[in-house]
C-alpha cells in the first residue's frame, strides 16, 4: 500500500482490508476502466439512511417534513465536499487527463461523489455498523449545529437545499402570466425541477409569493413534504 493512501486512511479513521475497494472509490468516471459510480450509489443510500436514523433519534418531536429538511442539509453536496476537503480528498482522486487539467480535483460534485463512494466501499469492506460509525464521526460537527429552527425556512430555500443534496441543478422559475389591474395583480409562476416530469405552479399577489407557492408544490410532488408540515 502506498504511503499516501495510508495517510488518507488515517484521516478517514478507517483502514481498508481490501485496498482495491478504496482505490475504486477514488476513481472518477473520466479515468480509464472501472469507476466509483456504483459505490457512490451505494454510499448515497447508506448516508441517507444513517443521517435519517440519527435525526429520528435526536429530534423525537420533529415532524416528517422537518426531518427531511434537516437531512437535506446534512447530506447536500456542499456539506460533503467540505468534509472531503478536510480529508484533502482531491489529492487522492484518480481523474482522466481532461478532468485533471480542468481542476476536477477541486470540483464540489466530484469531491462529494467520491466521499459517498468511500462510504459504500467501507460498508463492503467491513459492515453497516462500521459505515455508520464513520458517517456519524465525520458529521459530528454538522449534527451538533442542527436545531429545529433550521427547518423554518421558506419553500424556495428548502427546495434548493434538497436539490443540492442530490447534486441536481437548481430550480428555474418563470412568470407565465400576470392578471388583474396594476394595483391588484396576480402573478402565475411555473417552477421547473429536473427530477419532475411536470412543472409545478404557483400564484400570488407578487412574483416572490408565487415562486414560494410553486416551490412548495414542487416539494410535495417530490415527496419531500406532504403539505401538512
Swiss-Prot record:
Keywords: Cytoplasm, Endonuclease, Hydrolase, Magnesium, Metal-binding, mRNA processing, Nuclease, RNA-binding, rRNA processing, rRNA-binding, tRNA processing
Protein localization: Cytoplasm
Residues the record lists as binding Mg(2+): 40, 113, 116
GO molecular function terms attached to this record: double-stranded RNA binding; metal ion binding; ribonuclease III activity; rRNA binding
Pfam families: dsrm, Ribonucleas_3_3
Cofactor annotation: Mg(2+)
EC identifiers of the protein: 3.1.26.3
Principal subcellular localisation of the protein: cytoplasm
Domain called RNase III: residue spans: 5-127
Record-linked SMART domains: DSRM (SM00358), RIBOc (SM00535)
Subunit description: Homodimer.
Physiological role: Digests double-stranded RNA. Involved in the processing of primary rRNA transcript to yield the immediate precursors to the large and small rRNAs (23S and 16S). Processes some mRNAs, and tRNAs when they are encoded in the rRNA operon. Processes pre-crRNA and tracrRNA of type II CRISPR loci if present in the organism.
Protein name: Ribonuclease 3
Amino acid at each position: 500500500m502506498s504511503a499516501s493512501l495510508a495517510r488518507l486512511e488515517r484521516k478517514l479513521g478507517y483502514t481498508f482490508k481490501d485496498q482495491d475497494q478504496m482505490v475504486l472509490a477514488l476513481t472518477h468516471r473520466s479515468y480509464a476502466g472501472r469507476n466509483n459510480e456504483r459505490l457512490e450509489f451505494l454510499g448515497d443510500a447508506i448516508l441517507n439512511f444513517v443521517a435519517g436514523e440519527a435525526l429520528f433519534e435526536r429530534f423525537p418531536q420533529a415532524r416528517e417534513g422537518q426531518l427531511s429538511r434537516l437531512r437535506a442539509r446534512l447530506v447536500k453536496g456542499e456539506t460533503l465536499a467540505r468534509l472531503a476537503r478536510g480529508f484533502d480528498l482531491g489529492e487522492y482522486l484518480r481523474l482522466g487527463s481532461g478532468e485533471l487539467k480542468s481542476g476536477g480535483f477541486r470540483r464540489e460534485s466530484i469531491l462529494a461523489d467520491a466521499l459517498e463512494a468511500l462510504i459504500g466501499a467501507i460498508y463492503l469492506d467491513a459492515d453497516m455498523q462500521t459505515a455508520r460509525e464513520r458517517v456519524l464521526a465525520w458529521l459530528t460537527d454538522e449534527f451538533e449545529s442542527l436545531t429545529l429552527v433550521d427547518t423554518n425556512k421558506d419553500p424556495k430555500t428548502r427546495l434548493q437545499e434538497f436539490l443540492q443534496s442530490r447534486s441536481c441543478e437548481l430550480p428555474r422559475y418563470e412568470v407565465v402570466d400576470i392578471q388583474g389591474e396594476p394595483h391588484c395583480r396576480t402573478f402565475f409562476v411555473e417552477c421547473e425541477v429536473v427530477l419532475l416530469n411536470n412543472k409545478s405552479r404557483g400564484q400570488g399577489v407578487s412574483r416572490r409569493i408565487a415562486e414560494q407557492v410553486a416551490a412548495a408544490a414542487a416539494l410535495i410532488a417530490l415527496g419531500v413534504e406532504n403539505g401538512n408540515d
